[in-house]
UniProtKB/Swiss-Prot annotation:
Family listed: Belongs to the L5likevirus endolysin A protein family.
Domain of life: Viruses
The UniProt record lists the keyword NADP: no
Species of provenance: Mycobacterium phage D29 (Mycobacteriophage D29)
Record keywords, A-Z: Antimicrobial, Bacteriolytic enzyme, Cytolysis, Host cell lysis by virus, Hydrolase, Viral release from host cell
Stated name of the protein: Endolysin A
């Protein structure tokens, strides 16, 4: 269970570190209440974990060594350490208070460790979560100093290290502070602030629909889509589209009839061709985003509008290349580039964009939500699914349904929303129940048929009156005693 560290206690840990920074390196030593007593690399890491955990036995107790991590000693887990999962910090769902990197070389001078405190004490307080963190290390002495805090200390992810752990503890929640999502977008993409303000809704929609729910996915999406769309400028390809006019492999007609221009590349990922417009329409309809499953086939120019730019990219991201999010979780920039581009064209620009976005860290999550819990991507997905279940149309299964239109689409009379199906089922099912019950001698339901035959029922159309009279005629022919019983109880028909 993840330990919750109070801000006051985190401040105490920082004070303990600051008091010992500048000490000499002490191989085999341990920190004590005397701030001049010192320790080595593993003692520093293990005792700092004990400080965060509030253990009372830390004084003079170094707990173990770098080998304790390599050999999975129990004390490492007792202190609260866990090995980082393949997805890294992003896969945890929270920022731990401490991250650790290790070099394993059999102990002694060939092994080393350092850590980064992911809490930061700032002037005037309070302690807060930090995406960069404060590096904290005991190492070989430089000018008589072996214990470094901030400057001079290696970070947990220094290239020297190849084994990574975290302390399963996080800082307590603090007061919610407003974050300007447009500013975050500008920092993550290099866009001017005013452009970021204008693009934010389309970016947010695209990220949510693409299920980009962690910083790694968001950074990859911003980098790749930013490159593919000419820095988010192009919502339609710059060429006319005439080159696609007879591309039957894209679903366009073989004639030179303008299909190329109608269905040229649009959205930030350039959805191209009538077939792809149809596939995207069905996907968008299934999510409750458009009213019909052929919406963009009928209204292709709308796909050039900014509001669809990110959503179009999300369709490609999740449907056409469904492994991209998993690759993004692994930060596999090259493979994602191949999925989108077919090669590694302009990889340097994609990498530049990617690193720029990654540097923003967890604040990227601001782009997919706000203070409203309904902005949470999971909640929004549930809402879309519920909306789709209620209001998306399904085609009638009745063999008496109307024929399809000449273009293969369904007439509106064959399409039903859930509430329409319920009402339709009630309309057909109840009528059938009443008539069958009347034929079986149920005088209560026979009363309904008699009333309808007199033109006094809910449906007073000539067609339905004739239907009710036909039911009475069938009963009279097959079971006249039912009508006689009804007349005996109620009088003449």
């Amino acid at each position: 269970m993840t330990l919750i560290v109070t801000r006051d206690h985190a401040q105490w840990v920082h004070d303990m570190c600051r008091a010992r920074a500048g000490n000499r390196y002490g191989y085999g030593g341990a920190f004590t209440l005397n701030p001049r007593d010192t320790t080595d690399c593993s003692g520093l890491v293990l005792q700092t974990a004990a400080w965060y955990g509030g253990r009372k036995d830390w004084i003079g107790n170094r707990y173990g060594s770098t080998e304790s991590f390599r050999l999975d000693h129990k004390i490492v887990y007792d202190l609260g350490f866990r090995r980082l999962p393949p997805g890294g910090v992003a896969a945890l769902g929270f920022t731990p208070v401490m991250l650790v990197g290790l070099q394993h070389g059999g102990g002694g001078r060939y092994s080393h460790t350092a850590c980064t405190l992911m809490t930061m004490d700032i002037p005037g307080g309070p302690v807060k979560v930090s995406q960069r963190g404060v590096d904290w290390e005991s190492r070989g002495e430089v000018n008589g100093v072996g214990v470094f805090l901030y400057d001079g200390a290696r970070a947990w992810n220094d290239p020297l290290f190849h084994d990574f752990w975290y302390l399963d503890a996080k800082l307590e929640d603090g007061p919610t502070q407003s974050v300007d999502a447009a500013e975050i977008l500008a920092r993550a993409t290099g866009l001017a602030y005013n452009r970021a303000v204008a693009l934010l809704p389309a970016v947010r929609d695209g990220l949510i629909q693409a299920d980009c729910t962690n910083p790694n996915r968001i950074a990859m999406w911003l980098a790749q889509i930013g490159h593919e769309s000419d820095d988010f400028k192009a919502t339609a390809e710059y060429a006319s589209g005439d080159a696609y006019d007879t591309r039957t492999d894209l679903g366009n007609t073989p004639e030179v009839d303008g299909d190329g221009r109608l269905y040229k590349g649009r959205s930030w990922i350039m959805i191209t061709g009538k077939d792809n417009y149809r596939d995207f329409s069905r996907w968008a309809h299934g999510r409750g985003l458009v009213p019909t499953p052929d919406y963009f086939v009928v209204h292709p120019l709308e796909l050039s509008e900014l509001r669809w730019a990110g959503i179009g990219a999300a369709w490609y991201w999740t449907v056409e290349r469904p492994d991209i999010n998993a690759l993004s979780d692994r930060r596999d920039l090259e493979t994602v580039t191949r999925r989108i581009n077919g090669g590694l064209t302009n990889l340097d620009d994609r990498r530049r964009r990617y690193n720029l976005a990654l540097a923003v860290g967890d604040q990227l999550l601001t782009l997919i939500g706000d203070d409203d819990e309904l902005a949470d991507p999971t909640i929004q997905r549930f809402i879309r699914e519920i909306h789709g279940a209620l209001f998306n149309t399904v085609v009638t299964q009745s063999p008496y349904g109307d024929p399809q239109n000449p273009d293969g689409s369904e007439p509106r009379s064959n399409l039903w929303q859930l509430h329409e199906l319920i009402k339709n089922g009630d309309g057909m099912g109840h009528a059938r129940y009443v008539e069958e019950s009347a034929r079986a001698g149920d005088l209560r339901e026979l009363e309904r048929v008699v009333r309808a035959a007199k033109g006094l029922g809910r449906d007073r159309s000539p067609e339905f009156i004739a239907r009710a009279r036909n039911v009475l005629a069938q009963i009279e022919a097959a079971n006249p005693e039912y009508l006689q019983a009804y007349i005996a109880r109620n009088g003449a028909l």
